[in-house]
Every structure is written in structure tokens, then in C-alpha cells.
């Protein structure tokens, strides 16, 4: 028996209180784990969809690849990669703060509609679509990583409660109870022996 375990009534009460608290807290942890599992699955789908959207936008942009190097339009194309407004917030999901992307506004290059070919509008639109979709895909991935990390942390705590803390505390409680019961029986036996000796002396 571990020397750290105090075989006293106070220790028994403390261990019983600890076991009750663990038992009360475990359902909350398991509920949070279930919520996080659902949110992670949702985040996985969103991240996958965002990635596909970004890849499709990239392919559409690459269709104009040969036109990117035309010096006359290089400045206009480069400006489309500049972000004017990136509006973000924080969203609380199952106790986890994750980034919420609210609005993305890119720089709108100025050019003469009369002096530029019609396809330039399509080229610049494809660049903007790619940049915006990439920002949203990166945000979705960041949300997923944060939720997965919290799920991992909570899962470890649930396992700790179920596999170690609760069983160990229960076992400690049992050891103390057995010791106190044995000592009580011994004490009763000694008292009976003492009374018997006293009675014998009186006789």
C-alpha cells in the first residue's frame, strides 16, 4: 500500500468527495467531446469544399497564364493580389475561439475600358476569385486545426478521467474503507477483551 495514502476517515471523506467531483465533471467533458467531434466533421467538410473552390478558381486563372506577362496589363493584375479590407471576427464554438472571416475586399485596379481588350475584365475577375477563395480556404483550414487540437486535448482528458483518475480514486477509496473496517473490527475485539478482563478481575 502506497505510503502517500493516509488511511484515515478524513482521507476517506476527501477521496469520496474527489470521486463525486470527477463523476460530476466527466459527463460535461464527454458532452464537449461529442460537440467538438460534430464541429470537426463540419469543419472538415467546409475546409474540403473551400479547397476545391480555390483549386477550381486557380485553374480558371491559369487559363489566362499566357496573358500575365503582357507588360501593359502587369500592374493591373498585380493590384488584384492586394487586399484592401480583410474583416475578421472571433467565433466561439464549443468553448473554442476560432477565426470568422466576414469580408474580403481586394484592390480594384484602374484602367481605361476603351483602351483595353474585353478579356482583361475576365482575367482580373479570375485573379480576384482565386485570391478571395484562397483566403477563405486558409481561414477554413485554420478553424479546422484549432477545433482538432481542442478535440485532441478534451479526448485526452476524458481518457484520463475514465482510465486513470476515476479507477485510481475508486481503488484508493476501497483500500481506505477496507482498512477502516478491519481496524473497527479489531477495536471492537480489543474492547471486548478488555471488558472481559475487567469482569474477570471483579470476580
Curated annotation (Swiss-Prot):
GO terms for biological process: proton motive force-driven plasma membrane ATP synthesis. GO terms for molecular function: ATP binding; proton-transporting ATP synthase activity, rotational mechanism; proton-transporting ATPase activity, rotational mechanism. Pfam families: ATP-synt_D (PF01813). InterPro entries: V_ATPase_D. GO terms for cellular component: proton-transporting V-type ATPase complex. Disulfide bonds: none annotated. Keywords: ATP synthesis, Hydrogen ion transport, Ion transport, Transport. Produces ATP from ADP in the presence of a proton gradient across the membrane. Belongs to the V-ATPase D subunit family. This is V-type ATP synthase subunit D.
